[in-house]
């Protein structure tokens, strides 16, 4: 049985690990993977058709804990303990819930002190006792007690006291004064762990198509002072097609991983693929997982030839490998009654709305099947790749964009027919 320390408005954890409000989804999953022998039977709950309409939930079924992540920024918003019989809880080092100590209203009052009167919810038949960043829900023993605590009683205060002996049914840790209005806080400095994160990524565009990326980056850097003086730093960097390896390293730092391509599965869709001379060396990617970006370099020139932006939607084959890339892509729209204008595509745009903006149907997609090996099937199904303005949009079956691949301009001297090479 887990023995955990409760820190209101901040975290739930022990000496080895801690779930902290504002923590990115990938870090919480990394904790669960590292301690998989202790924390077992974890479920990932999300809406397959509308992933932005509901929180993304990690349900620790064996321990009675739910971690609720904001559907948009994918940071930890609420920690819910829904079965207190499966876990030991303490506050300031003193247990208020264990096999020997029942979490009664008297015990909560002794451990946490006085607060505003409890609020009664007649639909749930629960009392909610609220502290800043912490709420307890108490179960009533019977319906006969309910009329004593009508919501309109005492000028809006739902109760003057909760029945003696009532025990906690659920506990919530969140940011702010209200569980209903809470939002995931900014990522705590303790969660940066030496990584750089992207607050936003803007695609830079010229007359012919995308030319590079402008990234607004966050880092928890230390100045010349002590480690305790570490604070968040915000800075901007830009990388372009044709930049060298050294240019990218100086702008973004070292990648988390370097991946060498063994084959190009999209080559068959390029003009005259059989005439292309096989290369003796392979193109390679810089994988920046916390930026949600991959950068492909040409094996011969060692210059940028492709950017890949990842949205990290649940239900995609690459889910939880990348941090969500919050991108904005300007699209050139040509309409009969108006001159050329620009519309913005974001991480949260749906593909049908993009097609509607374009005002004309896009060509039929290439169907992409992913699997870890030739004999395995992808449980999430295929995705569809649409080419548009030197970009390829990978679209999931729920109409959300899984990734966007940006291509650089054709090499000088290349034939015009190869300009839209996928």
Swiss-Prot record:
Gene Ontology BP terms: Golgi to plasma membrane protein transport
Keyword Cytoplasm in record: yes
Localization of this protein: Cytoplasm; Preautophagosomal structure
Gene Ontology cellular-component terms listed: dendrite; phagophore assembly site; synaptic vesicle membrane; trans-Golgi network
UniProt keyword Cytoplasm present: yes
Keywords: Cytoplasm
UniProt function note: Plays a regulatory role in autophagic activity. In complex with BCAS3, associates with the autophagosome formation site during both non-selective and selective autophagy.
Protein name as it appears in the record: Phagosome assembly factor 1
Organism: Rattus norvegicus
């Amino acid at each position: 049985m887990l023995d955990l320390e409760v820190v209101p408005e901040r975290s739930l954890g022990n000496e080895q690990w801690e779930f902290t409000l504002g923590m990115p989804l990938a870090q919480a999953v990394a904790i669960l993977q590292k301690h998989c022998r202790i924390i077992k039977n974890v479920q990932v709950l999300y809406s397959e058709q509308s992933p932005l309409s509901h929180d993304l939930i990690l349900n620790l079924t064996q321990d009675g804990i739910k971690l609720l992540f904001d559907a948009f920024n994918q940071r930890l918003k609420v920690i819910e303990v829904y079965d207190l019989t499966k876990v030991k809880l303490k506050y300031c080092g003193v247990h208020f819930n264990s096999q020997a100590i029942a979490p009664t209203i008297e015990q909560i009052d002794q451990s946490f002190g006085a607060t505003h009167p409890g609020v009664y919810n007649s639909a749930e038949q629960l009392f909610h006792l609220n502290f800043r960043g912490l709420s307890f829900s108490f179960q009533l023993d019977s319906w006969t007690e309910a009329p004593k605590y009508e919501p309109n009683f005492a000028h809006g205060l739902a109760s003057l006291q909760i029945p003696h002996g009532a025990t906690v049914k659920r506990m919530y840790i969140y940011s702010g004064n209200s569980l209903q209005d809470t939002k995931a806080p900014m990522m705590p400095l303790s969660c940066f762990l030496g990584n750089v994160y992207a607050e936003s990524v803007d695609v830079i565009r010229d007359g012919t198509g995308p030319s590079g990326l402008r990234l607004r980056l966050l880092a928890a850097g230390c100045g010349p002072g002590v480690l305790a003086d570490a604070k968040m730093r915000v800075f901007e960097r830009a990388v372009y097609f044709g930049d060298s390896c050294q240019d990218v390293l100086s702008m973004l730092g070292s990648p988390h991983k370097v991946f060498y391509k063994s084959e190009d599965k999209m080559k068959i869709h390029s003009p005259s693929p059989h005439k292309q001379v096989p290369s003796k060396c392979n193109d390679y990617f810089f994988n920046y997982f916390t930026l949600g970006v991959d950068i492909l370099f040409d094996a011969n020139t060692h210059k940028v030839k492709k950017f890949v932006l990842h949205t990290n939607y649940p239900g995609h084959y690459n889910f939880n490998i990348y941090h969500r890339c919050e991108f904005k892509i300007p699209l050139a729209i040509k309409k009969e009654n108006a001159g050329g204008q620009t519309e913005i595509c974001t991480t949260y745009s749906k593909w049908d709305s993009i097609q509607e903006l374009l005002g004309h149907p896009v060509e039929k997609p290439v169907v992409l099947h992913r699997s870890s090996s030739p004999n395995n099937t992808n449980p999430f199904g295929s995705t569809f790749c649409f080419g548009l303005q030197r970009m390829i949009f990978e679209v999931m079956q729920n109409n959300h964009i899984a990734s966007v691949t940006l291509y650089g301009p054709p090499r000088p001297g290349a034939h015009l027919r190869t300009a839209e090479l996928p």
